């Protein structure tokens, strides 16, 4: 089972197929006995979102690197929330950070109850929001932070809280959509898909009307389309 990517909130099946890069360029490590893989496209898309095309001066490039570090920590902590909770329930887990986000994969163990599934899904955005709040408290309370230090923790706060909140939008396959699916139950999958499509379309319209960053309506449009295909497929069953 794959969790949806985080920082742009788009499922692996909904993103363009990026060419495979040599595994030598992949970062691999273990954290809390959980394998973690960071694919090269993760850094490239994170740099794009951070404004690499606008970074001209040495200071702007350094700020971009700090933003990428903040994004990496925030997304990794989010996925650890999913993974550690799943591991607590006896699952084998792995974390992958890829283009436009990441996911926690888990398998094995016994069948999860709806409440256990809810806890696994909710743990990601919950711990990410706590990380953002901790970064905000640090910025407010700690005196003597360097300008770059303050910039880093402000960005860590922003990306953690904003991305976690976006990921709680009730649109499949984001965490909010998964929570809705868990609460309504498998018998109401059609209703979950209908709600996901409606919310995604509303967000696309509002994003275009209020000229919000184009990434959000693009990805919401993709998710609306994927959910529509899923709805059509179960209609034939």
Regions found by a protein language model. Give the residues of each.
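Hydrophobic transmembrane alpha-helices and their immediate loop junctions
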Residues: 8-237
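Intrinsically disordered, low-complexity Ser/Thr- and Pro-rich stretches
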Residues: 1-2, 8
């Amino acid at each position: 089972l794959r969790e949806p990517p985080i920082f742009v909130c788009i499922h692996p099946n909904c993103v363009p197929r990026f060419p495979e890069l040599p595994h030598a360029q992949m970062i691999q490590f273990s954290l809390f006995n959980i394998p973690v893989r960071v694919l090269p496209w993760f850094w490239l898309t994170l740099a794009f979102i951070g404004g690499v095309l606008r970074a001209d001066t040495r200071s702007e490039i350094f700020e971009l690197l700090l933003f990428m570090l903040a994004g990496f920590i925030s997304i990794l902590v989010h996925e650890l929330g999913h993974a550690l909770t799943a591991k607590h329930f006896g699952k084998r887990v792995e974390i992958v950070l890829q283009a436009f986000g990441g996911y926690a994969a888990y398998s094995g163990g016994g069948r999860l109850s709806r409440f256990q599934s809810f806890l696994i899904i909710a743990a990601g955005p919950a711990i990410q929001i706590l990380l953002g709040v901790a970064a905000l408290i640090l910025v407010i309370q700690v005196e003597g932070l360097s300008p770059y230090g303050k910039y880093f923790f402000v960005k860590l706060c922003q990306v953690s809280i904003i991305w976690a909140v976006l990921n709680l939008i009730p649109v499949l396959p984001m965490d909010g959509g998964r929570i809705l699916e868990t609460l309504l139950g498998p018998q109401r999958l059609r209703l979950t898909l209908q709600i996901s499509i409606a919310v995604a379309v509303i967000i696309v319209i509002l994003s275009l009307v209020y000229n919000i960053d184009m990434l959000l309506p693009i990805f919401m449009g993709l998710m609306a389309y994927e959910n529509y295909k899923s709805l059509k497929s179960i209609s034939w069953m």
